[in-house]
Amino acid sequence: MSVKNTQYYIDLENQYGAHNYHPLPVVLDKGEGVFVWDVEGKRYYDFLSAYSAVNQGHSHPKIVKALTEQAQKLSLTSRAFYNSNLGEYEKKITSIFGFDKVLPMNSGAEAVETAVKIARKWSYEVKGIHENTAKIIVCENNFHGRTTTIVSFSNDPDANNNYGPFTPGFLKVPYNDIDALEKLLENPSDIAAFLVEPIQGEAGVFVPDEGFLIKAYELCKKNNVLFIADEVQTGIARTGKMLACDHEGVHPDILILGKALSGGMYPVSAVLTNDEIMNVMKPGQHGSTFGGNPLACAIAIAALDVVEEEKLSENAQKMGEIFRSKINEIISETNLITAVRGKGLLNAILINDTPDSSTAWDLCIALKENGLLAKPTHGNIIRLAPPLVITEEQLHECISIIRKTILEFNK
């Protein structure tokens, strides 16, 4: 009889699962707050937070309570009927973020697809673009999901190699290049929207220059082009504000949320906008069997309550400043790390090596051995994003682990 240890579970996945991920060799079995435990019982600090889906911490009791109570009452109705949770959730989320309407979905990619459809429909029915000619501007090195349409406007070879033919109708500009965006908008007659991540997460936590977002927003307004913010990873307090756009006072025409909208407890995403834009959608024109289900709504309400009640935006802002300051001290002691960048508790360190090297991966393995889990986003970048419930004492312990690992690795 085989022992059910780490290797057993890794072998099981390798044998029966598609090989479309390259996980760190750790098998997680339990999570609570900022901690996760592997099947052997070793405890780790989680510095990925499921790509910012568990901002509220693992197994938050309030969110668990909402899930278990609602699951025993009513989980799914489809949208063929009204349910007693959806309206309450819609009222709450539109109130928090300042929009008229929300369209509920499940995954982040679904929400991006939904936003694209809404923007195109608005462009034909309100702006008056000739049918089937609307364009959406996107940024190079973007990550908005993995559906066929979304990878159509990715320039990551892993995302789109051998998946064609691709969906047309997208124009690319370099990220953080306001001049390139302005040039594309010189003739805005067939442009429906500009879709942007306020901080590019998968690209390596690339923070644009201050003023880029507000200038881009103003250009869109001037040219009657919708400004769509994909805050699936940056939203829900991760960057020290409820939205990363809030740092520049930008209120998007269309807002995309996901991940931490449920505290990592259930797939919940949302597209928010105003009446003029959302009202182009009519019954039967878009939907989802699971979107807006009673269970999802109960969980999302609880998850949003936790963010507000525990002041997670404020904690992310404070802890993020401490983190970057301390990492900069480590940088002065080593030539392995060249920079730290980020906002709030969405951060990354840049490794002094090439993007195709294994150094970032090897360093993550060493961090794992020392009790902290993180993942490279490229060969020379490591994203560091703990749950937003982390305390200052815990953060300092994590910084000590990172420092020890880097200095030992550098020998």
Positions of the model-derived regions?
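Conserved N-terminal phosphate-binding loop of PLP-dependent enzymes in the Aspartate aminotransferase
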Residues: 2-411
